[in-house]
Amino acid sequence: MNINLTMFGQLIMFTMFTWFCMKFVWPPIVMTMEERKKRIESGLLAAERGRSEQEEMQAKAQEMINQSKDQAAEIIANATRQASNMVEDAKDVALKEAGKVKAQAQAQLEQDTIQTRNELKNQMSDLIMQGVSVVLAKEVDVKVHQKMLGKLSQSLS
């Protein structure tokens, strides 16, 4: 056999093998590679979307936390204001009640003072009557009367 003929035969076989591979083997391999490429691209896009959605959700969560903190601070401020108002109202009520109690005590003191003065006047009038009856029981003497009235005034003061 001739080397050229062998080479020519191998060239024909290689061409047929290449044509067969290009016609029947290569398209499924290329199609499988394209499908995998598309699947990988869609996976990467989904991962990127997931990452961006995660960042958005984290931003929203942080915003909600900040809003909650602001609301909590506002609630605390309102509660503090309300508590101070309640304390002020209680102080006002206590001062009014203290004023009433003071006025009642003052009125009671004045009433007791008047009652004591009346009792003292009654006792004084009794003592004066006793002194007058003693003076009248004895003889009417100016010197003696002045001494008795002096003793009476000393006993009264």
UniProtKB/Swiss-Prot annotation:
Keywords: ATP synthesis, Cell inner membrane, Cell membrane, CF(0), Hydrogen ion transport, Ion transport, Membrane, Transmembrane, Transmembrane helix, Transport. GO terms for molecular function: proton-transporting ATP synthase activity, rotational mechanism; proton-transporting ATPase activity, rotational mechanism. One of its GO terms (cellular component) is plasma membrane. It is found in: Cell inner membrane. Its main location: membrane. It comes from the Bacteria. The chain crosses the membrane at residues 7-29. It is a single-pass membrane protein. F(1)F(0) ATP synthase produces ATP from ADP in the presence of a proton or sodium gradient. F-type ATPases consist of two structural domains, F(1) containing the extramembraneous catalytic core and F(0) containing the membrane proton channel, linked together by a central stalk and a peripheral stalk. During catalysis, ATP synthesis in the catalytic domain of F(1) is coupled via a rotary mechanism of the central stalk subunits to proton translocation. Belongs to the ATPase B chain family. F-type ATPases have 2 components, F(1) - the catalytic core - and F(0) - the membrane proton channel. F(1) has five subunits: alpha(3), beta(3), gamma(1), delta(1), epsilon(1). F(0) has three main subunits: a(1), b(2) and c(10-14). The alpha and beta chains form an alternating ring which encloses part of the gamma chain. F(1) is attached to F(0) by a central stalk formed by the gamma and epsilon chains, while a peripheral stalk is formed by the delta and b chains. This is ATP synthase subunit b. It comes from Ruthia magnifica subsp. Calyptogena magnifica.
